[in-house]
Swiss-Prot record:
This is Imidazolonepropionase. GO terms for biological process: L-histidine catabolic process to glutamate and formamide; L-histidine catabolic process to glutamate and formate. Coiled coil: none annotated. Zn(2+) binds at H75, H77, H245, D320. One of its GO terms (cellular component) is cytoplasm. It catalyses: 4-imidazolone-5-propanoate + H2O = N-formimidoyl-L-glutamate. InterPro entries: Amidohydro-rel (IPR006680), HutI (IPR005920), Metal-dep_hydrolase_composite (IPR011059), Metal_Hydrolase (IPR032466). It comes from Aeromonas hydrophila subsp. hydrophila (strain ATCC 7966 / DSM 30187 / BCRC 13018 / CCUG 14551 / JCM 1027 / KCTC 2358 / NCIMB 9240 / NCTC 8049). Gene3D superfamilies: Metal-dependent hydrolases, Urease, subunit C, domain 1. Binds 1 zinc or iron ion per subunit. Belongs to the metallo-dependent hydrolases superfamily. HutI family. It is found in: Cytoplasm. The gene is hutI. HAMAP family: HutI. SUPFAM superfamilies: Composite domain of metallo-dependent hydrolases (SSF51338), Metallo-dependent hydrolases (SSF51556).
């Protein structure tokens, strides 16, 4: 028996690894291997043909089943209260969003409901959403604030996100998105809201250890380039990574700004220009594609996938779960839409929810690949090829999931 395997607490024999390793082509598929875990990390990955008994005490034969890294949903807004179903109905009848917003709908309706909910209520509302992702194979999820838009309500959302990670078998990364919209109280003075974010909310979130990163919605209906820079400077002062909702509805130059700040990722990108693409490529910033929002809003302007591919920009894929523009709680569906709507290959979609999604969260040294030394987050699938994970939607193919070396039986 291989010495490294003998040192493992658990060994999975006869797995077919789709490693998603950056140094291997396509899915990084290997012949049947034994995968050993020690102290929460992948400790050994050994070809079956090189093994001789005896096997360690805790082993199981997976009979050739496909194993992939755990899926990573790197952009969600899944903590919220209230429903926008009536708004959806009105929009299908042709009522413009501006009119809906004037009547109290839109994002501010979610803000009102989220402010009114206590932490326990928000936790209970978010619980089934996260459990749905877990059932699909998500082992890491990013959760943003952004529906509180006061100091206490933004922190409340972040506390709920942390609690979800403690209560469920999933790793949660948190992002402060106080610069999501201008709250009603600051409608006539948005610069004062930006000052509040920079001088009060970011310091409080950082000091409480509630935020892993800071995000800004940089758009003509959101925050200007100058305001975005202010928020990024404040985040940098507190040692927080930055991200950006960029170039979804127009191009303000936000992606270039974010790249200059060394952002982890810029997200949406339908209006990304060549200058922005080169900036992302130069700084190694991840382009996160959100096809569910594109689909739900019936957009027609596609993100420049071919240009991103040519420039070598890593492309992540995420669900963008939110009540207004992407009420679709399915990373697997986002993978499918990334292929069918945006033209990604299934290999790119799979890399987009593993290796590149890990980079979008700053976790590329720990997550997103099956590689010795990385955290033991992986999935066992009842399917013959990893392309099925982007192709066949709505069928439960997950056999089991492992996070930090601990197996969670599926179901």
């Amino acid at each position: 028996m291989n010495k490294e395997l003998l040192n493992c607490e658990r060994v999975w024999l006869n797995v077919t690894p789709a490693t998603l390793r950056s140094d291997l082509a396509d899915y990084g598929l290997l012949e049947p291997h034994a995968l050993g875990v020690h102290e929460g990390r992948i400790h050994a990955l050994v070809p079956m043909q090189d093994l001789k008994g005896p096997y360690p005490a805790h082993w199981q034969d997976m009979k050739g089943k496909l194993v992939t890294p755990g899926l990573i949903d790197c952009h969600t807004h899944l903590i919220f209260a209230g429903s926008r179903a009536e708004e959806f109905e009105l929009r299908q009848k042709g009522v413009p969003y501006a009119e809906i917003a004037r009547k109290g709908g839109g994002i501010i309706s979610t803000v009102r409901a989220t402010r009114a909910a206590c932490e326990e209520q928000l936790f209970e509302l978010a619980l089934p959403r996260v459990k749905s992702l877990i059932r699909e194979g998500v082992t890491t999820v990013e959760i943003k604030s952004g529906y509180g838009l006061t100091l206490e309500d933004e922190l409340k959302m972040l506390r709920v996100a942390r609690r979800l990670g403690e209560a469920l078998p999933i790793r949660v990364k948190t992002t402060l998105l106080a610069a999501h919209a201008v709250p009603p109280e600051y409608r006539d003075d948005p610069d004062s809201w930006v000052e509040t974010i920079c001088q009060e909310i970011i310091p409080a979130a950082a000091e409480a250890g509630l935020a892993d990163a800071v995000d800004v919605f940089c758009e003509h209906i959101g925050f200007s380039l100058a305001q975005t820079e202010q928020v990024y400077l404040a985040a940098d002062q507190y040692g927080l990574a930055v991200k950006g909702h960029m170039d979804q509805l127009s191009n303000l130059g936000g992606s270039t700004l974010a790249a200059n700040f060394g952002a982890l990722s810029v997200d949406h990108l339908e209006y990304l220009d060549p200058e922005g693409i080169q900036a992302l490529a130069h700084r190694g910033v991840v382009a996160t594609l959100l096809p569910t929002a594109f689909y739900f809003l019936k957009e027609t302007k596609l993100p420049p996938v071919a240009a991103l591919r040519k420039a070598g920009v890593p492309m992540a894929v995420s669900s963008d779960i939110n009540p207004g523009t992407a009420p679709i709680v399915s990373l697997r569906m986002a993978m499918n839409m990334a292929c069918t709507l945006f033209g990604l290959t299934p290999v790119e979609a799979m890399a987009g929810v593993t290796r590149h999604a890990a980079r979008a969260l700053g976790e590329q040294e720990q997550l997103g690949q099956l590689r010795v030394g990385m955290l033991a987050d992986f999935l066992v699938w009842n399917c013959g090829h990893p392309a099925e994970l982007s192709y066949l939607i709505g069928v439960d193919q997950l056999v089991s999931r492992v996070i930090n070396g601990e197996e969670t039986l599926h179901g």
